[in-house]
Structures are given as structure tokens and as C-alpha cells.
From Swiss-Prot:
Cell location: Cell inner membrane
Major place of residence: membrane
Identification of the protein by name: NADH-quinone oxidoreductase subunit D 1
Subunit structure: NDH-1 is composed of 14 different subunits. Subunits NuoB, C, D, E, F, and G constitute the peripheral sector of the complex.
Entry EC number(s): 7.1.1.-
Reaction(s) this enzyme catalyzes, per UniProt: a quinone + NADH + 5 H(+)(in) = a quinol + NAD(+) + 4 H(+)(out)
Membrane topology designation: Peripheral membrane protein
Any GO MF annotation of the entry: NAD binding
Lineage top rank: taxon: Bacteria
Native organism: Solibacter usitatus (strain Ellin6076)
Length: 409
């Protein structure tokens, strides 16, 4: 069997030949087991000395067929699948799925549930950005920042554990509201974090922003034109670092985001350093949103009054036969969703996350497709690194903040 006939083999026209300077070109394989690709990403690069002449990303190593799995699950069961797509921002994926199905059901969500969703997804954004900043800094040689970022991330994970019992795969949002009543004392835990975190962001910036090594490795590196970004469908902090103020929370508000006061950070330099600046400022804005949600949290129900969709309270099940019947039917048979199709967009930490859901009127979705930001953003790799030095590849791909589960699905 020839190389071109091997199943799954990526055939790339990269051949070592004579360079213009009379030297030899070399084909370098980076990944898929490489610590700085942050997942199973493979890059095939053609080098002329230390210059990258051509780069081809090879993805798909983390493909799970998760979109097909949706078709075999009841709508309420599929929430747990969404956690596994972008595993650094599970609540963002929970929210996108729930909003899409709720739109098909024309289900009205109580204000407290909406605000709680906003607060927790912004904490998720902070969690994700902390992982990005810590690992990105570590890749470039700043180990202290990595340790400090994970120190703060630990406090956020403790908040998630308080709400859901889980640190990462939380599955805390449900179609119709939340999975559980918000726990006692959550305000004190969140306030304790908010009182400390702004000074921690200052600490990160003091270590990096004016650091000559950091600026030397990030300024003017990883440039890609705005036209190319739009052609490739790049969204999120990468696009905002190129000067476009596009954010679904502002442009297409959902879950009461229109009631919150925050800014959308942008830059115009469009390099690795600009993406760092945008994400750091996003952490400040997310902290601002979390505080507004905590202090202005509406009173009332934390899930919709829809017994055919939302599981009844445990106390009602002990005393009301009707509640017990509804619980049994939802768990064993699911609930029917009106026939139709919907596309719901939210702003995940990595960019525009869209859920396209088709219902045929049964208890399981007919088709689900996710427009994940990591897949689009990863298309920028060749444009970003070709013509640059091999030493700058790690900084460039680190600035994209992609998640391979989000890319491969």
C-alpha cells in the first residue's frame, strides 16, 4: 500500500529540495505529542534554515463524533455532551445548547436563572483565560505567571464545585434554568474571589507587559491581515485584537446581557502582544460583570414553571403524585420539542460559538451542528507562521487559544 492510500494519511506536498541560497530545505514534524501545541495538534512545516516556508496543520486526532452522539440522546441528556466539546469552558457550551432548545420550545427563563447563567459563564471565561495566560507565558519562559494563574483558577473551580459538585464538567445549566438551587453562601465565596482578583491581574501585567523578553517574543509576531481573518471566519479575541469590536454579548444579547454594563476591549496591532492585551482586559471586564450579577441578582425562581420539560422539586415528588409522574416521564421518555430549526450564537472565551439544532418533533434532535471558534481560528496558522522563524511558532499558536476538543469535536 502506498503512502497516499493509507487511511487517514495527510498527504502534503512538502519535499526537501534546494533553497534559493543553495542549501537544503527540511520538512519538520511538530506534534501531535508536543507540550506547546496544548493538545493533539500536528504541524507539518517546510523549513529553509530557520525560516518557515510552508505550514500545514493536521487536525482530527481528538475527533469523537460528538455531533452524531446528540442524535441518540434526549434533549436534557445532551447537556452532559456539551461539557466535553470545549472542556475549558463547559458552562459556555451548556448555555449555547440550552438557549437553542429553549428557543425551539419558546420557553421563558426566570430572571434569576438568566443572571446566574451570566455570572457563571463569565467566571468560566476567567477560568479559560487564566489557563491560556498561564500556559502561554510558560511556553515563552515565564514560569511564575503560570503558577499565579493556576492559583486564582483554583478558587474559581472551588466556586463551580460549590454550585454543581463538579470542578470541570459541571453540567450545571439545564433546559429551563439551572440543575440545582444556588447553594447557601455562594455570595460570600464569589465576593471573596472578586475582592482579590483585580489586584492579581495587575500582578500578571507587572510581570509581563513591560518585560523586555516578553515584548521581544510577542510584539510584531504572529501578524495576519484583517482581510484574511474575515475570509477564514476568525472570531473572538483574535478578531478584536485586529480592531473589530464584534462580540455576541453586545451585538446579539442573550440571557440578559443587555442589562450589564461592560466594554468590549480591542486593539489594532494584530500581533501576539495585542491578543494578550485584549484577553487581559477581558478578564477585567468579566470581573466587572460577575460583580454586577452578584450584587443585582434578582429574587425568585431558578427554573422555569414548565413541568413537562423541567424536573420537579424533590419535595414535591414526596407529596404529589403528579410531580412524580412528570419526573418519571422526563427521565425515561424525554420531552418532545416542536418541529423546526434554530441557530443560537453565544460568545465563548474563544469566540463565536453557534449551535444549529434541527428538531423533527420527537424527544431527540434530528441534527446538531456546532460552529466552534477553535476550528475557525486554527485556520489562521499557515497565514500567521509562514515567512516567520521557527522560534516564533510557539508564541503564534499560543496566542490563538484554541482547544482541540473544540476543533475536532
Amino acid at each position: 500500500m502506498s503512502e497516499s492510500e493509507i487511511p487517514g494519511q495527510v498527504v502534503v506536498d512538502l519535499e526537501a529540495d534546494q533553497s534559493a541560497e543553495g542549501g537544503r530545505r527540511m520538512v519538520l514534524n511538530m506534534g501531535p505529542q508536543h507540550p506547546s501545541t496544548h493538545g493533539v495538534l500536528r504541524l507539518l512545516m517546510e523549513l529553509d534554515g530557520e525560516n518557515i516556508m510552508k505550514c500545514v496543520p493536521d487536525i482530527g486526532f481528538l475527533h469523537t463524533g460528538i455531533e452524531k452522539e446528540f442524535e441518540e440522546k434526549f434533549y436534557q441528556q445532551a447537556v452532559t455532551l456539551t461539557d466535553r466539546v470545549d472542556y475549558l469552558a463547559p458552562l459556555s457550551n451548556n448555555l449555547g445548547w440550552c438557549l437553542a432548545v429553549e428557543k425551539l420550545l419558546q420557553l421563558e427563563i426566570p430572571p434569576q436563572a438568566q443572571w446566574m447563567r451570566v455570572m457563571l459563564t463569565e467566571l468560566t471565561r476567567l477560568n479559560s483565560h487564566l489557563v491560556w495566560l498561564g500556559t502561554h507565558a510558560l511556553d515563552i519562559g515565564a514560569m511564575s505567571v503560570f503558577l499565579y494563574c493556576f492559583r486564582e483558577r483554583e478558587e474559581i473551580l472551588k466556586i463551580f464545585e460549590l454550585f454543581s459538585g463538579q470542578r470541570m464538567m459541571t453540567s450545571y445549566f439545564r433546559i429551563g434554568g439551572l440543575a440545582l438551587e444556588p447553594p447557601r453562601g455562594w455570595q460570600q465565596r464569589v465576593k471573596k474571589f472578586l475582592d482579590v482578583f483585580p489586584s492579581r491581574i495587575d500582578e500578571y501585567e507587572n510581570l509581563l507587559t513591560n518585560n523586555r523578553i516578553w515584548t521581544g517574543r510577542t510584539k510584531g509576531i504572529g501578524f495576519i491581515s484583517l482581510e484574511d481573518m474575515l475570509d477564514l471566519g476568525i472570531t473572538g479575541p483574535m478578531l478584536r485584537a485586529a480592531g473589530l469590536k464584534i462580540d455576541a454579548r453586545k451585538d446579539a444579547p442573550y440571557s440578559s446581557y443587555e442589562k450589564f454594563d461592560f466594554e468590549v476591549p480591542t486593539s489594532t496591532d494584530n500581533d501576539v502582544f495585542a491578543r494578550y492585551q485584549v484577553r487581559v482586559e477581558e478578564m477585567r471586564q468579566s470581573t466587572k460583570i460577575v460583580r454586577q450579577a452578584m450584587e443585582g441578582m434578582p429574587a425568585g425562581a431558578w427554573k422555569a414553571d414548565a413541568p413537562h420539560v423541567v424536573l420537579p422539586d424533590r419535595e414535591k415528588m414526596k407529596t404529589q403524585m403528579e410531580a412524580l409522574i412528570f419526573h418519571f416521564k422526563i427521565v425515561t421518555e424525554g420531552f418532545r420539542v416542536p418541529e423546526g430549526e434554530v441557530y443560537q450564537v453565544i460568545e465563548s472565551p474563544r469566540g463565536e460559538l453557534g449551535y444549529y439544532v434541527v428538531s423533527d418533533g420527537t424527544t431527540k434532535p434530528y441534527r446538531v451542528h456546532m460552529r466552534t471558534p477553535s476550528f475557525g481560528n486554527l485556520q489562521a496558522v499557515p497565514k500567521m507562521v509562514e515567512g516567520s522563524l521557527i522560534a516564533d511558532v510557539i508564541a503564534s499558536i499560543g496566542s490563538m487559544d484554541f482547544v482541540l476538543g473544540d476543533t475536532d469535536r
